[in-house]
């Protein structure tokens, strides 16, 4: 279980997180939504221990990660897999080398074991037989799948998805959403998805948390979010700007 308690973080004059409280249960799929620049990625960095809070706690299985030494923090991070918005593949490496990048550097795995685990990961994301291809040979959706294969090769307990459908057309986005659901069910992992895509939210989410003005504004099911009458929630999920806002 992951528990965030009264988390606060300021950058200069901007209070990005202002008392975030959030509990993420083992095995659930939580979608985090909110305005651009509203602190979703900052919250994610705190959960994985990449950013230190000004105050508050992030508890992973009961341990406050802000007070762990580097070795203990590394052990916690091994529980996590991450699919980045851009897939973050190395263009000069093959698909196999990308997926096995960290695994190969541990030097306690045989080449045969690494090859087997890469093949298993690719099969799980429905991309068998592409080990020798370079990222430039892949479409955007295929790159996302390879990025997910890299995230799951460690067999993590928690997978983070940062805008997994950004830059993809609706058909490919739908296939990625369905893949996320299948991977979650097959691996029985906790999944945390950051997205602005309301179709994706409805497809993958079991519970949704909305971050607004530095705090968790509300939580609920995707259906509850789409049916919300609260103007802050309603405008966001329908993509309607406030009349007081001006876009330039």
Regions found by a protein language model. Give the residues of each.
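Helix-to-loop junction immediately C-terminal to a conserved catalytic motif
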Residues: 48
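Conserved ABC ATPase "signature" region
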Residues: 63-64, 111-129
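Conserved ABC ATPase signature
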Residues: 134-138, 142
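A short, proline-enriched helix->beta-strand linker immediately N-terminal to the Walker B motif
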Residues: 153-157
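Catalytic Walker B motif of ABC-type/P-loop ATPase nucleotide-binding domains
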Residues: 159-162
């Amino acid at each position: 279980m992951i528990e965030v308690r009264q988390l606060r973080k300021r950058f200069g004059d901007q209070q990005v997180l202002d008392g975030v409280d959030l509990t993420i249960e083992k095995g659930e799929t939580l979608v985090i939504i909110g305005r651009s620049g509203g602190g979703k990625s900052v919250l994610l960095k705190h959960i994985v221990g990449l950013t230190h809070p000004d105050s508050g706690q992030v508890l992973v299985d009961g341990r406050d990660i802000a007070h762990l030494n580097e070795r203990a923090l590394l052990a916690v991070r091994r529980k996590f897999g991450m699919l980045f918005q851009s897939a973050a593949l190395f263009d000069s490496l093959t698909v196999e080398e990308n997926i096995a990048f960290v695994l190969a550097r541990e030097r306690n795995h045989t080449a045969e074991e690494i090859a087997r685990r890469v093949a298993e990961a690719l099969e799980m994301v429905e991309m068998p037989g592409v080990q020798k291809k370079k990222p430039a040979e892949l479409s955007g959706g295929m790159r996302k799948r390879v990025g997910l294969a890299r995230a799951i090769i460690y067999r993590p307990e928690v997978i983070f998805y940062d805008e997994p459908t950004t830059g993809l057309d609706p058909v490919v986005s739908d296939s990625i959403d369905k893949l996320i659901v299948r991977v979650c069910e097959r691996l029985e992992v906790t999944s945390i998805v950051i997205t602005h895509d309301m179709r994706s939210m409805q497809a993958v989410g079991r519970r949704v948390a909305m971050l607004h003005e530095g705090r968790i504004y509300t939580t609920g099911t995707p259906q509850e979010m789409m049916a919300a009458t609260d103007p802050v929630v309603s405008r966001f999920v329908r993509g309607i700007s406030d009349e007081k806002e001006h876009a330039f």
